[in-house]
């Protein structure tokens, strides 16, 4: 196994673990069902191999879902991004309330979030430094196995280079 293959294996494991955590923690207490399965958030997960390691890309609002958001009368992030994310969600899920326009439905949802907050669904743990082993606790066990594979791959490449 070469280094790139070992990194690809790690990237796949990270994506699989995040998806497993979404399945485990994705239940919305207000809706009573897992609203994260097959969601835009889940499909936004992209783990790629870079020269320096792996990179995780995920929808910008993941933090508000994972950490929740306390009722403060303020909105998470910028207002434009907040409205866009809610509008996209309403559109994707084809949410209708009587004869209300989509913009009116979006306003009702935003007002509800302002007043009631968002219950946390900790499919990932927030870490300021972006340390994946802190963000995804199950990853630690996998890292040990993966590191052995990576070390062996590096040693093989070193042997090829010097021999």
Can you say where each PLM-predicted feature lies in the sequence?
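Charge-rich, low-complexity N-terminal segments
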Residues: 1-46
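Charged, low-complexity interaction tracts
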Residues: 35-163
């Amino acid at each position: 196994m070469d280094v790139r293959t070992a990194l690809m294996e790690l990237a796949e494991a990270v994506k699989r673990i995040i998806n497993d955590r979404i399945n485990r923690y994705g239940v919305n207490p207000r809706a009573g069902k897992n609203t994260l399965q097959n969601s835009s958030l889940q499909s936004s997960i992209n783990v790629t191999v870079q020269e320096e390691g792996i990179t995780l890309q995920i929808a910008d609002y993941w933090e508000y879902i994972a950490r929740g958001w306390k009722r403060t009368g303020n909105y998470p992030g910028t207002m434009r991004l907040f409205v866009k994310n809610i509008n996209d969600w309403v559109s994707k899920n084809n949410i209708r309330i009587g004869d209300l326009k989509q913009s009116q439905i979006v306003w009702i949802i935003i007002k509800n979030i302002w007043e009631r907050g968002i219950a946390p669904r900790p499919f990932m743990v927030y870490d300021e430094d972006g340390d994946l082993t802190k963000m995804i606790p199950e990853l630690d066990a996998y890292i040990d196995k993966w590191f052995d594979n990576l070390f062996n791959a590096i040693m093989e490449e070193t042997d090829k280079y010097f021999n």
